[in-house]
From Swiss-Prot:
Keywords: 4Fe-4S, Cell inner membrane, Cell membrane, Electron transport, Iron, Iron-sulfur, Membrane, Metal-binding, Repeat, Translocase, Transport. Belongs to the 4Fe4S bacterial-type ferredoxin family. RnfB subfamily. Residues 32-91 form the 4Fe-4S domain. The gene is rnfB. [4Fe-4S] cluster 2 binds at C117, C120, C123, C157. Residues 108-137, 138-167 form the 4Fe-4S ferredoxin-type domain. GO terms for cellular component: plasma membrane. Disulfide bonds: none annotated. Residues 1-26 are annotated as: Hydrophobic. Binds 3 [4Fe-4S] clusters. This is Ion-translocating oxidoreductase complex subunit B. Its cofactor is [4Fe-4S] cluster. The keyword Nucleus does not apply.
């Protein structure tokens, strides 16, 4: 019976010492997150398209929040995202990179001409949001609800059977973005 109490005491002491060491290590080696990075990342559209030159929205948010990158590189977000970033970071709004269509982007989705698709899966590998389904040597198709219109699947296609088509605005997909409407507080 005594050996049972010794074992319980030894394991309890070991657990207590391990907890103290892990607690100290967690505090000592804690990585502090920059709250500005989190706020910038929340504003970005999270399409992970790479059109800004970064592999995703989080790396672009880190580059913008450190002050080294321009706020006008997010093509899917358009002018709305750029204005929100300018307000958050207290910098001057900048014209968007690209042509005039970048200021007011039109939602587009990928369309695969299935008759010409050879099933090489290069578009599936390029899609950052897994919006393309299919198998090797079989037809592929795009799930338009998941497609962000990033255009990354078009270039790898060896048969040029993928094109970006604009999505018609209907009552089912139209969203009134109330955050873009300027609101002024009137004095009493």
């Amino acid at each position: 019976m005594m050996s049972l109490w010794i074992a319980i005491g030894a394991l309890s002491t070991l657990a207590l010492v391990s907890g103290v060491v892990l607690g100290f290590a967690a505090r000592r080696f804690q990585v502090d997150e920059d709250p500005v990075v989190e706020q910038v990342d929340a504003i970005l559209p999270q399409s992970q398209c790479g059109q800004c030159g970064y592999p995703g929205c989080r790396p672009y948010a880190e580059a913008v929040s450190t002050g080294g990158e321009k706020i006008n590189k997010c093509a899917p977000g358009g002018e709305q995202v750029m204005l929100k970033l300018a307000e958050l970071l207290a910098v001057e709004p900048q014209p968007l990179d690209g042509d005039e269509s970048a200021a007011h982007p039109q939602r587009k989705v990928a369309f695969i001409d299935e008759a010409n698709c050879i099933g090489c899966t290069k578009c599936i590998q390029a899609c950052p949001v897994d919006a393309i389904i299919g198998a090797t040597r079989a037809m592929h198709t795009v799930l338009s609800d998941l497609c962000t219109g990033c255009d990354l699947c078009v270039a790898p296609c060896p048969t040029d059977c993928i094109e970006m088509i604009p999505v018609a605005t209907t009552t089912a997909n139209w969203k009134w973005d109330l955050n873009t409407i300027p609101v002024k507080n009137l004095p009493n």
